């Protein structure tokens, strides 16, 4: 039977050693689901609230016992006494949103609500004897995503003197996900050798990418291109580049202040100059995607950027849209960006996550399913990417088990789908004219 009989949350640790929420859901038939909630380092100001304790005597104030208690003492009784079925995903998510009663899930915490939402879905999949991607996507979930591999970390994700937060490689020319992963791994290892030969650090950042002291953005790009060529692949054909600028992290008083991360070598650019700079990089290098190229509140700047290069480069809104259909709808109406980054903990339920993906796809925007910098061994985002035919996934570099777990899950899914699965490569960027 699908009726929920037990819900239990506990405090566990994420990939940065910070507390996060784990939730388990059990049905009367023995079906079981477990979910772990991720956490971000650079967060949009409009994201759903990640509830932390603030008690400096525990985990430097980052404990999540309040969120855990909200699951065990408030949400669990509602689910059990209400005799909810794990097959009632939308009703359960709606109930938790109403139980919270705030616009940003600030009362119960998005980390509490999301843990329950995902655990319920996993229990439902277990009940039906289906893989999670098949339960969530039905028979139509079959597209393996292009991996956006963050192999160089900057900004808030490392100590490297580079303002941009992520430098990614996208192996769009591969024939399968399996091959794209191999290409990415070979680029990663060649990059490590190149860095060693230059006497640069090969320690990795939060998301598994290298964080060496490059001379600047273009030095990082040129070095990555060298690693791609060392594998025998062609930049701009087999492999493209991508940036997560995380511009909100260095936007101060109307100025894009690169000096915040790059010191005395960092420029200070107006919105117009920021657009010019990004266009210059796009014209010079094989860049196919740019995330958060402008500040989350600089909608005028976003519009200029979109009008300027939005036909040839994927412009992804992360802090801009925060997986929120209200924000996304406004962006679509105004012609801002052409893609949305999907982070389940930005909005807090699976239902709202799927609503955002559906809205984007109907409008001709792409949806990029994403991890957070503080991750766990949970692989739900891999299943979501396939279930929704998102076509792209962003889940870190080719190191750290918290990142590799997602890639390995996609390898399993590709094997399970066999001939019915597909990897569309460059066709996944249907929002571009090139």
UniProtKB/Swiss-Prot annotation:
Class of the enzyme per the UniProt entry, highest EC level: lyase
Q: Cellular location of this protein? A: Cytoplasm; Secreted; Cell surface
Binding positions for Mg(2+) per the UniProt entry: 244, 291, 318
- SUPFAM superfamilies for the chain: Enolase C-terminal domain-like (SSF51604), Enolase N-terminal domain-like (SSF54826)
**One cellular component (GO) term of this entry:** cell surface
Which CDD domains did the record assign? enolase
> Which Pfam families does the UniProt entry name for this protein?
Enolase_C, Enolase_N
Spell out the reaction equation it catalyses. (2R)-2-phosphoglycerate = phosphoenolpyruvate + H2O
Provide the binding site for (2R)-2-phosphoglycerate: 165, 343, 372-373, 394
Query: Which keywords fit this entry according to its UniProt record?
Result: Cytoplasm, Glycolysis, Lyase, Magnesium, Metal-binding, Secreted
What this protein needs as a cofactor is: Mg(2+)
* Pathway where this protein functions: Carbohydrate degradation; glycolysis; pyruvate from D-glyceraldehyde 3-phosphate: step 4/5
What PROSITE patterns does the entry give? ENOLASE
EC number(s) of the enzyme? 4.2.1.11
What are this entry's molecular-function GO terms? magnesium ion binding; phosphopyruvate hydratase activity
Domain of life here?
Answer: Bacteria
| Lyase found in the keyword field | yes
Which positions are catalytic residues?
207 (proton donor), 343 (proton acceptor)
Instruction: Tell whether Metal-binding is among the UniProt keywords.
Output: yes
Cite the cofactor comment. Binds a second Mg(2+) ion via substrate during catalysis.
A GO BP entry is: glycolytic process
**Protein family per UniProt:** Belongs to the enolase family.
Quote the function comment for this protein: Catalyzes the reversible conversion of 2-phosphoglycerate (2-PG) into phosphoenolpyruvate (PEP). It is essential for the degradation of carbohydrates via glycolysis.
Do you know which HAMAP family this protein is assigned to? Enolase
Q: What is this protein called?
A: Enolase
- The source organism is Staphylococcus saprophyticus subsp. saprophyticus (strain ATCC 15305 / DSM 20229 / NCIMB 8711 / NCTC 7292 / S-41)
Q: What is the lineage of its organism?
A: Bacteria, Bacillati, Bacillota, Bacilli, Bacillales
